[in-house]
């Protein structure tokens, strides 16, 4: 579903940061200021968000992977929920340095987590002493929190979707280093540099975060559905061709 200007207004997407904290590189996206708060120009934000959704839709149709990144308190739950709904990996606890640039190390941790989960399934924890079981539980909980959202990510993602580029500077830098496209919400206090698909908007409001994440997840699901429909149509076309020439 397409996001509307009214939805953006209701979610407070237009509220930027205090004027004294602004980044001049965001000037083209600022409408003005009110009560020392910058107001973001939604006439710029809406088409830019639509462009980002279009890109995401195409990527998903081609079976691309989009990593959702949002570790701030107000975005944590929404990021996990919407990424799971779209069948995509996510990071919502803390970005571990090297998650993309040192993927080999991450793979080792993922294997450890999967082995531990398999041990739980097999009932192996029941054979452990109380102390061993406690240490095991602590380790698996820590791994699930830090990398549980990326355990099924087979490799470096095709793109990353980030809420708050300043807070996730390391993630953006790693993506830039690897040539991974960045789709990101950029507030008035940060620079849009290094972001391929800029979404100028409020990155602190939980309502605004939900709007962005839902919009990206919807685009992914639409892209996948379109790809499936195209395959079905192609198969039908082949069947009709066979019947005509039978």
From Swiss-Prot:
It comes from the Bacteria. The keyword Ribonucleoprotein applies. GO terms for molecular function: structural constituent of ribosome. GO terms for cellular component: cytosolic small ribosomal subunit. It holds the Pfam family Ribosomal_S2. One of its GO terms (biological process) is translation. Keywords: Ribonucleoprotein, Ribosomal protein. The keyword Ribonucleoprotein applies. PANTHER family: 30S RIBOSOMAL PROTEIN S2 PROKARYOTIC AND ORGANELLAR (PTHR12534), SMALL RIBOSOMAL SUBUNIT PROTEIN US2M (PTHR12534:SF0). Belongs to the universal ribosomal protein uS2 family. HAMAP family: Ribosomal_uS2_B (MF_00291_B). This is Small ribosomal subunit protein uS2. It comes from Burkholderia vietnamiensis (strain G4 / LMG 22486).
């Amino acid at each position: 579903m397409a996001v509307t200007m009214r939805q953006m207004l209701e979610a407070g997407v237009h509220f930027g940061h205090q004027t004294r904290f602004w980044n001049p590189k965001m000037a083209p996206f600022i409408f003005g200021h009110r009560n020392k708060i910058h107001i973001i120009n939604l006439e710029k934000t809406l088409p830019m968000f639509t462009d980002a959704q279009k890109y995401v839709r195409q990527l998903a149709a081609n079976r691309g992977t989009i990593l959702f990144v949002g570790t701030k308190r107000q975005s944590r739950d929404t990021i996990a929920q919407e990424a799971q709904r779209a069948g995509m990996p996510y990071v919502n606890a803390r970005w571990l340095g090297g998650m993309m640039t040192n993927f080999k190390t991450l793979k080792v941790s993922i294997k450890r987590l999967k082995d531990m989960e398999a041990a739980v399934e097999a009932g192996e924890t029941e054979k452990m002493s109380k102390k061993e079981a406690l240490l095991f539980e602590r380790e698996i909980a820590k791994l699930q929190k830090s990398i549980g959202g990326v355990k099924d990510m087979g490799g470096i993602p095709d793109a990353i979707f980030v809420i708050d580029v300043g807070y996730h500077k390391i993630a953006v830098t790693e993506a830039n280093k690897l040539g991974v496209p960045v789709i990101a919400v950029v507030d008035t206090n940060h620079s849009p540099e290094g972001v391929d698909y800029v979404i100028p908007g409020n990155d602190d409001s939980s309502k605004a975060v939900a709007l962005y994440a839902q919009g990206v997840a919807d685009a992914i699901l639409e892209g996948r559905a379109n790809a499936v429909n195209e395959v079905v149509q192609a198969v039908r076309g082949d069947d009709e061709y066979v019947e005509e020439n039978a």
